[in-house]
Structure formats: structure tokens, C-alpha cells
Amino acid sequence: MDFTPNSAINHLNLKFDDVPVSDDFSKDDLAEQLNVFTNPYFLDLEPSSMLSEGYYGFVSQPSGSSNSNKQEKNVQQQNPEKISTLQQVKEEEVSNTFSAPLNATGNFSSANPASIDLAYLDLQKLLTLPDHSKETQEKTSSQRELFEQKSSVASASKDNVSSSSILQGSASSKLLPDQSARQHQVLVGQTAIPTSEASSSINNTPLQAPVSSFADQNAFTNPLSTFASPDLASVSSPSLSSYKGAQSPNANSKRTKATSAIRTAAEEDKRRRNTAASARFRIKKKLKEQQLERTAKELTEKVAILETRVRELEMENNWLKGLIRPTSNF
């Protein structure tokens, strides 16, 4: 607990009827007065004589009673023995208030005086005075009586609700038949309860006890034995034709439209692919033809050149032969 003078002033800033507030005093005076609590020898002092009058729960007197205060002071000056006895009583009260927390925490000498926790001092209890007037006692007694009446009414209403619910549940259980009992009657073979319409005819007939056979008892104990196991071969799955027949014509028309649209789209894609492939083939064919034509022209030109060369060579050969023959004749 932070025990600084300012924080202590804020904690002590309590408002009560006919009691002075800390705002009426200067903060410096209060700080000086509260610094006394940090003194380790606080118990040897008299805080009641050091603090101002009308503080710490002492009711301030009105201005008209100043003369009476002066008279009391004069009486105290005349009787110093009474004053000393009163001071001793005050010291004992202060020591009793401070001794309980100190004994709980430990020795006063070992504790740090600055960190003493004054939470043990309930200032509100010291400042508030108990009101023993008849009016307050009557109010509290009337409030207690009202609270007791309300609690008794609430408990009685709860008991009534619970009892009514229990009665309703018992009546409904009596009115409604038990399903398990009914099933037991059906399985064992007991006679059904006669209705009001058929009561006359049933009363005329003599009652007979039901004859329970060994087979009925076995059927009741093992109800699954009465049912025959179905043949798996006889169980046939529904055929596609029945499934198609169960379909509505609107669904068939929608499906045909969807399939036709898909087919048209596929056919268009095929046509586009075929046209593109044929165009590519034609272009390649034209290129090959152009190349063949070029090669043919080049070859024809070469053939013509070679033919002219051959002719020239033949002429030279003949001319050389003519030159050689006359020389050979000689």
C-alpha cells in the first residue's frame, strides 16, 4: 500500500454528514499531521492532541456553541486531574487499536515504519457512528419482515408449481396407456380391452383364458426367427428401361438438345480442322511444283549450254583432223 501523504489524503477524503471534509484544511497541514504515522515511536505520542479538532470522526459543533466550548476549556484548566485521566483513557484506546495489527505482523521494531500497512485501520468504522434511533430500528425490522414474507411466498409458489406438475404427470400417466404393455399383450395373445360400443356383445360371451403354445413363446422370445431370410437371387435391381421410362419427357428433350448442341460443336471443330489441313497440303503442293519448274528450267538451260559446247568441240576436232592429214600424205 502506497503510504505517501498525498495518497493518504486522497484515501481520507470521505464525506459524512456534519463532518468536516479534507478540502476544508490545507494539504500542507494534513501532510504534517500524517507524517506522524511514519514515526516508529508513534505509540508514545498523543495523536488526539496533535491533530486538529473536529477531525477523525469528532462532530464539528456549530458556531453558536463557541461559548460552551470556552466554558468547557475553563473547566478543564481548573481540573487538571480529570484531564490526565481522560488522556490516559485515550492513550489506552489508541494502543488497543494499533496493537492488534502489530501483533499479527510481528515486532514493531523489526517492521519498516514507512511500509506499515494501515489497512487494519478501518477509517470508515472509526468515522461512522452507529445510529441507535428508534426509527432506524423500525425500518430495519420492517425490511426484514418484508423480505421474509417475499421469500415465503416464493417458496410456496414453487411448491405449488411442483405439486401441480407432479399431479399432471400422474394423471397423464393414468390416462395414456403404456406402449410396452400394449406390445406385450399383442405378442403374448391377450384379449384386447373392450370398448363401450362392443361391451354388450362381449359381456354375453364367456371369458376364456388365452392358450399360449410353445411356438408362441418361441416367437415372443425370438421375434427374428419368424421372418424368413429373403433370397438374394430373387431381389433384382431396377433395369435401365424402367429407369428411362420413369423419366419425364422434359428431361429427355433437354438431354437431346444438349447432346445435339455438343454434336454440332464437335462437327464444326472437325470441319475447321479439315479445311486447315487441306489448305496446308495445297500450299505445300504448290511450293513443290514451283521448285520442280525451277529445276526443269535450270536443267534445260544447262542442256543447251552443253549442246553448244559439244558442237564447238566437234568443230575443233574436225579442224584438227584436217590439219593432220596433209602432213601425213608427205
From Swiss-Prot:
GO terms for cellular component: nucleus. Residues 133-148 have a biased composition (Basic and acidic residues). GO terms for biological process: positive regulation of transcription by RNA polymerase II; regulation of transcription by RNA polymerase II. Pfam families: bZIP_2 (PF07716). Residues 244-262 have a biased composition (Polar residues). It comes from the Eukaryota. The keyword Heme does not apply. Residues 292-320 are annotated as: Leucine-zipper. GO terms for molecular function: DNA-binding transcription activator activity, RNA polymerase II-specific; RNA polymerase II cis-regulatory region sequence-specific DNA binding; RNA polymerase II transcription regulatory region sequence-specific DNA binding. Induction: Ubiquitinated by pof1. Mediates cell growth arrest in response to cadmium exposure, which is essential to maintain cell viability. Regulates cadmium stress specific genes. PANTHER family: ACTIVATING TRANSCRIPTION FACTOR ATF 4/5, CRYPTOCEPHAL, ISOFORM A. Interacts with pof1. Belongs to the bZIP family. This is Transcription factor zip1.
